[in-house]
Design a protein with these regions (language model features):
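Conserved helix-turn-beta segment immediately C-terminal to the redox Cys motif
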Residues: 40-60
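Bacterial N-terminal signal peptides
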Residues: 2-15
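Short active-site oxyanion
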Residues: 24-25, 48-50, 80-83
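Stable alpha-helical elements in mature extracytoplasmic
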Residues: 32, 39, 54-57, 89-93
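Thiol/selenol-based redox catalytic cores and closely related redox-interacting motifs
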Residues: 64-150
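Local sequence-structure signature of Cys/Sec-based thiol-disulfide redox active-site neighborhoods
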Residues: 20-46
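Active-site-proximal beta-strand/loop segments in catalytic clefts of secreted hydrolases
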Residues: 28-30, 53-56, 87, 110-112
């Protein structure tokens, strides 16, 4: 766990890459998670460089990064000092990086909504993309599948 913690700290401490052509993120996931791989493909297709790391103690990483339990999903990523939890659409990660709202530690799609990026489904669910930080959360966008509706 110490090695993973050191890797996370080193990755988050690197100079912001908002000016880089290809935003780079590190994704922590279970080796057996198929939807995580589909979400990673979604991010790559939308111009992100992704470094994936299979870990055995994902909950410990979430705790270390301050992911609220109620926002937990199957994978956790870090990019430019922000946490990305779950099946967040690439457009909202870009928006987070562009807007950089004060006091925000990360963005999340709690659970695993059907139709969200990485969760293909015949019928897509409506779900919220939330920002979180300092013990609070707020809606950032609302989607049905991969289509933003609010």
């Amino acid at each position: 766990m110490r090695l993973v913690a050191a890797a996370i700290i080193a990755f988050m401490a690197t100079a912001p890459n908002a000016l880089a052509e290809t935003p780079r993120m590190q994704v922590f996931k279970d080796a057996a998670c198929g939807c995580c791989d589909i979400w990673i493909d979604h991010m790559v297709e939308h111009g992100f460089e992704v470094v994936a790391q299979n870990v055995w103690n994902l909950n410990g990483i979430k705790d270390l990064l301050g992911v609220p339990v109620r926002m937990s999903s199957c994978h956790t990523a870090v990019i430019d000092g922000f946490v990305v939890e779950g099946h967040v659409p690439a457009a909202e990660v870009r928006r987070l990086l562009d807007e950089r709202p004060a006091g925000v530690a990360g963005i999340a799609v709690p659970g695993m909504p059907d139709g969200s990026p990485g969760m293909p489904a015949a019928v897509a669910e409506r779900y919220d993309v939330l920002i979180f930080g300092a013990g609070a959360s707020a809606p950032f966008a609302t989607y049905v599948g991969e289509q933003r509706v609010e």
